[in-house]
Amino acid sequence: MNVLLTNDDGVYAEGIFILASYLVSAGHRVVVSAPDRERSATGHAITISYPLRAYKIKLNIKGEIDVYKIDGTPADCVKLGVEKLAGFKPDIIISGINDGPNLGYDVLYSGTVSAAIEGWMMGYTSIAVSLNSNGQYHFKTGADFIVRLLNNFDFLSLDQKMLLNINIPDLPGEKINGIKITKLGKSLYEDSFEKRFDPMGKPYYWLTGNNVDNNIHDSTDIWAIKNNYISITPLKIDLTDLSQIDILNHNLNNL
């Protein structure tokens, strides 16, 4: 398959390097178009106020692969990669492997997931893949799973393009309990800003906070990861709340 690969951790991150290596070794044609630095939690931002620059670089990966670092966001990397850099029409766009999970409401902040959404909006089946990092960094577990997924699921025959959010436990493959098809859970935080001072005595603020442990149902991505399952969540981007339309029509009749 022709694979466009991106991430939000940056082009030199371990997760994208290992995934690219596995994909090339499995016989896939891969082009990497990724940010030149850390771009986590940038959401679906795109660059419109200044030009983007792309630099072709080398990564120590055996086999044919073109790698570009972009001074833009993950969504920028997908747009530019598809339109100008790849040299082929992608069969699939993959974003990851992210260092850290993207579960529940966090997908709305995630540059990793937003890059996949951008690919889907452009008409391509797209996958975001993240590792629930706990210090072990089993990126190879995630890379092996993605290769097996591409080998066993015929994405090319689908009438509708898919948008998938995949989270992988940070474990050796043999310790994973299986695969769960899930829905998004509710990941909520108690946010706080810590006030600090720079060497000039001027204040700045650092966002901190704690995860609020909600009721976690066994159908959610959060439950699956907590119980050492691979979570696969099909996503859509229509945010319309259909249940509110009649209420609004009724109450705004005389406005």
Swiss-Prot record:
Enzyme Commission number, as recorded: 3.1.3.5
Binding site for a divalent metal cation: 8-9, 40, 98
Alphabetized GO MF terms: 3'-nucleotidase activity; 5'-nucleotidase activity; exopolyphosphatase activity; metal ion binding; nucleotide binding
Keywords, sorted A to Z: Cytoplasm, Hydrolase, Metal-binding, Nucleotide-binding
Cofactor(s) this protein cannot do without: a divalent metal cation
Catalytic activity: a ribonucleoside 5'-phosphate + H2O = a ribonucleoside + phosphate
HAMAP family recorded: SurE
Protein name: 5'-nucleotidase SurE
Species in which this protein is naturally found: Halothermothrix orenii (strain H 168 / OCM 544 / DSM 9562)
